[in-house]
């Protein structure tokens, strides 16, 4: 009797030289950057992301000694505008090359992490193909989206945790949270992962203790040296960046970098299941309360995932990001990159038949297509299709939840993911 081949065995059937794959991925991204120049000059629909022009304008204000927040709709850390000042001094393409470089750095970190997990070079590179030759990250970074920077910071954090360099990991984590708010959800699984684990005999003795005693023991182990070091260094990094930019730019830095994203209620159509509710209640006195209440499902699911899967930190962070994006108040296509950059690390431990994986992938694209159809009619024909967009968003939510359930049910924790002692 033959068993269905899972995607790990399917990848092993290919001989993938790492240098060749990275070279092709680099050339493809460079070609897309220059194609974007051509399309921007010749076609009505521009290739370059509108946010890239916002970044460049903000960088221009920085070069003039003024605030980047003089540019309307700039809702990012000033650090990004500082990094893109060569857009003004050298070439407007500098930022795109920076983003595709971070894109490739993300792939390299994926490769190194897979090697640390015990995979061979050929198999590790085979999994990296799902990022290197994925058209979505290729298009997003070459269009001028900065999410590849955050992806590389998140992967750097996980890499240095695996290498047991806790202080280095904490520095990168502090930068990641400063650049984007979503990695802050990783702090609980990271802390649980770094705390010392009890042996079997200690577990048996602990089971006879009261709830208060078990809670005290849990908190005591949570205050281990590794956890305290990580929290202290990450906190100092984040606070130092925030204090420095607050000193220079004042309240507008806090408002546009942090508070805007915490209280954001985007009533424009997007993939979020909440958008239609927020759209209909935009003028209601309950609008703000409903927006805050939307965090509750995220909080419950993220907490459950943390305690269930913290031993495999990479898998736990993948679940965290997928849950955060799926149940967020705002969800656009670029948000998918937040968890797709972790998918190659998860794939070796998800023993799923490749045919089922292909079916799930097709459903994922079908869900987006069903949403894009009424969204196109709304944007370009001006017809009221909000209800259909919302229903398509609910269907896409169902698809994403089904995919997550399938990934969890086929997840097999390997011996390669055994706990590392940090103390």
Curated annotation (Swiss-Prot):
GO terms for molecular function: glycolipid 1,4-alpha-mannosyltransferase activity. The keyword DNA damage does not apply. Residues 1-17, 111-169, 246-287, 351-357, 406-423 are cytoplasmic. InterPro entries: PIG-M. Its main location: endoplasmic reticulum. The keyword Membrane applies. It is a multi-pass membrane protein. GO terms for cellular component: endoplasmic reticulum membrane; glycosylphosphatidylinositol-mannosyltransferase I complex. GO terms for biological process: GPI anchor biosynthetic process. Residues 39-89, 191-224, 309-329, 379-384 are lumenal. Disulfide bonds: none annotated. It is found in: Endoplasmic reticulum membrane. The chain crosses the membrane at residues 18-38, 90-110, 170-190, 225-245, 288-308, 330-350, 358-378, 385-405. Part of the glycosylphosphatidylinositol-mannosyltransferase I complex that is composed of PIGM and PIGX. Interacts with PIGX; PIGX stabilizes PIGM. Belongs to the PIGM family. This is GPI alpha-1,4-mannosyltransferase I, catalytic subunit. It comes from Mus musculus (Mouse).
